[in-house]
Amino acid sequence: MNSPVSCALTPDQVDRFNLDGFLVLPHRASPATCAALAAAAGEQLQAHIPPLEYEADLGYPGAPVSRAAEGGTTVRRLRGTFGRGAVFRDWAFAPEVCEPVRQLLGAPLYLTLTHHNAVMTKHPRYGTATGWHRDNRYWSFVQPQLITAWLALGPEDATNGALRVIPGSHQVALAPGQLDALSFLIEAHPDSAALVARATEVSLQAGDVLLFDSRLF
């Protein structure tokens, strides 16, 4: 009888997360799990089952100007993923993702059902980039010890909008006026150039999990 595979992180992985503010865990979800999640998300995307976030509603650079415009019904996110079916809930509670997050936090886990309870659906033509930001701008918790878990359902690289992060930026104290009214980093600010110069792309394969501190850019 085979022993169960541990989902725990090594001390080196914990140290790297604490230093860089993010950590890639390869092959955390099986091909079958990724296929089931992608199929369920695709069906709901095709049917435009709410709640949804549309590119046109956000108005980021390059987005359709309205829902009536060409590409105006392009969906950016399937929101409320936890309530969209058992396949999503099963993954949310999977030890492959819960155990390392619990280990990094050193505290009981709580799953937030607000902003990041979602499937990102980046469209090749109408999908838009998001400016540099920290995820904790979306939340109002007293303590900032929050971790986002991102599961790649397919390959993510420079050709299709892979995430970019700034290693160590979760520990950076910003200067006054370095964020705009929506808490996006003002890249023209004198103190931002050196920060953005450290940015790196996070390439992922289907099944890889990216964990990152909510204070990371």
Locations of the language-model features?
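Non-heme Fe(II)-dependent double-stranded beta-helix
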Residues: M1-D20, P26-W132, Y138-W139
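Double-stranded beta-helix
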Residues: N2, E156-F217
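Short, solvent-exposed loop/turn segments at secondary-structure junctions
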Residues: S30-P31, V119-T121, R137, E156, ...
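A structural signal for well-ordered alpha-helical segments within the folded catalytic domains
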Residues: P95-E99, I147, Q205
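Active-site region of the double-stranded beta-helix
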Residues: A107-Y110, N136, F141-P144, L151-A162, ...
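A structural signal for short, well-ordered beta-strand segments
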Residues: N117, A149-L151
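Coil-to-beta-strand transition motifs
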Residues: G127, P144-L146, V209
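A short beta-loop-beta micro-motif enriched in histidine and acidic residues
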Residues: R134-L146, A197-R198, L204
